[in-house]
A protein has these predicted regions:
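ADP-ribose/adenylate-binding Rossmann-like module
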Residues: 1-4
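Internal alpha-helical scaffold of NAD(P)-dependent oxidoreductase catalytic cores
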Residues: 7, 11-17, 33-70, 82-120
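Short pre-catalytic strand/loop immediately N-terminal to key active-site residues, enriched for Gly-Thr
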Residues: 18, 68-73, 125-130
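Active-site capping/gating segments
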Residues: 20-35
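A short acidic, helix-capping loop that chelates divalent metal ions and anchors anionic groups
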Residues: 28-32, 70-72, 141
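A generic short alpha-helical patch detector that favors 3-5-residue windows
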Residues: 77-81, 105-106, 131-134
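NAD(P)-dependent Rossmann-like dehydrogenase/reductase catalytic/cofactor-binding core
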Residues: 108-165
């Protein structure tokens, strides 16, 4: 995030109405995110129109300027991280005999469905994980393998690395 409200105020003619936004690539299929800086110079009607347009692309979220770098990193870089996760899941399934096209479809739908479930219910992601992890079952074995390899810290570190760039 290079230009925010104050930057545009200095660059644009006085009285120009503007809103800083950061869309991500899934807006191409109306399943994306448009991060909007909470501070703007739009009228209430203009902001309502902008929200309507951006919500048609997926989800529109207003954030304070200080949160723009982290929010933009999460939503803007996240699709690359999700794609790596989909590819890794598919590679694991292919290694065990699932055809690649099928593995990609399964991994992508699983990720999309899980995300939609969390958005629809508001359930804490940890509770969603716990609901799938039966005692002594296969899922908890897989979760333990991810934890041993530092999955969570690797994901968190990727956000830190980008925000501090």
């Amino acid at each position: 995030v290079n230009l925010l409200f104050d930057d545009y105020e200095a660059l644009l003619a006085p009285g120009t109405h503007h809103l800083s936004t950061l869309p991500n690539t899934p807006v191409a299929v109306n399943e994306g995110i448009v991060i909007c800086e909470a501070r703007h110079s739009l009228t209430n009607d203009e902001k309502a129109t902008a929200d309507e347009l951006f919500n048609a692309l997926g989800l529109s979220v207003d954030v304070d300027a200080k949160a723009m770098p982290a929010a933009g990193t999460l939503s803007g870089c996240g699709p690359a991280f999700a794609a790596i996760f989909i590819e890794a899941l598919a590679d694991g399934a292919v290694r065990h005999g699932v055809p690649r096209v099928t593995a990609y479809r399964l991994a992508s739908q699983m990720l999309a469905g899980t995300a939609k479930l969390q958005l629809a219910t508001g359930t804490h992601p940890g509770a969603m994980k716990d609901a799938v992890c039966s005692p002594g079952g296969t899922t908890i074995v897989g979760v333990a393998a991810l934890e041993r390899r530092g999955f969570r810290s690797a994901v968190m570190d990727s956000i830190d690395a980008i925000v501090s760039k």
